[in-house]
Amino acid sequence: MDADALSATPAAQAALEALRAAAGADGPMERHCLRQFAIAERLAGDRAFDRELLLCACWLHDAGLYIPSRDPYVTEGARLAARVLEPFGWPPGRLQRCMDACEQHHAPRSRMAMGLEVELVRQADLVDVTAGIVSFGLDRRWLRALFRDVPRDRFWRLVGGAVLGELRHRPASLTGVFFSPRRTRV
């Protein structure tokens, strides 16, 4: 899978560039987002979804980790999505769905009511972070092949560093990440 080839629209290219500006190119975060998108597409099955929105949300969902703030990093990710994507003239409802996908990706319960893409980002993130232990019915052979094709090396170091950074710099925000994510509006 090639991140640049996948990002065929100007909005997707801008989202990928925003991720790379924050986290670096072809690092563990970019590969996590790439795997997450592949997993989300697979989870969608034959259901119709907004592919560009899903890809942009996957690129931007964790980028808030790199933004200094007292607010939850998922909220910063939603704000970044708005800043990156507003210039492309997305209708407010579409932009809101992308922001929700970023902000709600650690929600403890389904976010299907906010849109299929929001729930796909949430489920796909959980599949990748758990290395397929949580699979939402995906074929484990397919997941193993994905993890070979888009390597997971240095991913756990990234996750550990992110958790420690959040605990050190904005510990009070963690409940807003995992238990009661807010909803930032367009």
Language model regions located:
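His-Asp-centered metal-binding catalytic motifs of divalent-metal-dependent phosphohydrolases/nucleases
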Residues: R51-S69, Y73, G77, C98-H106
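Divalent metal-dependent phosphate-bond-processing catalytic cores, especially two-metal-ion Mg2+/Mn2+ enzymes
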Residues: D2-S7, R20-A48, L60, W90, ...
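Short gly/ser-rich anion-binding loops that grip negatively charged ligand groups
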Residues: D26, I67, D71, F88
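An active-site-proximal "capping" alpha-helix that borders the catalytic cofactor pocket
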Residues: Q36-A40, P72-F88
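Generic hydrophobic secondary-structure packing signal
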Residues: A11, M29-H32, Q36, L53, ...
